[in-house]
Regions:
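Active-site cofactor/substrate anionic-group-binding motifs, chiefly glycine-
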Residues: 1
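ATP-dependent carboxylate-amine ligase
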Residues: 7-169
Length: 169
């Protein structure tokens, strides 16, 4: 979303728009589907980014949590189609989450075991669940009032179900 905003600002400047007009346009931007969609409930802030996941987009999404208030929690699933370095790339995402100050990482999916390993190796807290249903069942015990939660995985993981469960807490 940041890159799109910067590109939009550049186009706006080239068309003679003022900084105020550009800022107003960016402030009113709404994402499509589950691409960096920020949802607010009376209890939580949820960043639902379930459409696609790769190491760079996941790292950027984790970094964006710094802009939001609340305890930082990531609910992460497998990033698919990464090739032969899949485990190492998942582990690096986990390390990045811990280094960024994420207090809790919840994962499901075989590949996401490496995310948990990365979180733990960097001194963070991570929980791995055998399937999405088990993860969803654990949400009421692990999520607190005021949490800011990133939900991100490759689309085939169907993490929109996790977002729906969080909205119902």
């Amino acid at each position: 979303m940041v890159y799109a905003a910067l590109a939009g600002a550049a186009v706006g400047h080239s068309l003679g728009m003022t900084d105020e007009e550009i800022a107003r346009g960016i402030a009113h931007y709404q994402t499509v589907g589950d691409r960096a969609r920020v949802l607010h409930t009376p209890k939580l802030t949820i960043v639902s980014d379930c459409y696609n996941a790769n190491p760079s987009s996941t790292a950027a999404a984790i970094e964006s949590l710094r802009l939001l208030d609340g305890r930082k929690v990531c609910v992460l699933g497998d990033m698919l189609e990464l090739g032969e370095n899949t485990a190492a790339l998942h582990r690096q995402v986990g390390e990045r989450a811990a280094q960024a100050g994420v207090e809790l990482v919840l994962c499901t999916g075989e590949l996401s075991r490496s995310i948990c390993e990365g979180v733990r190796s960097a001194g963070g807290t991570a929980l791995w669940f055998p399937d999405k249903d088990a993860l969803i069942s654990a949400l009421p015990e692990t999520i607190r009032m005021g949490d800011c939660i990133l939900v991100k995985a490759s689309h085939i993981m169907a993490f929109e179900d996790v977002t729906k469960a969080l909205l119902e807490l």
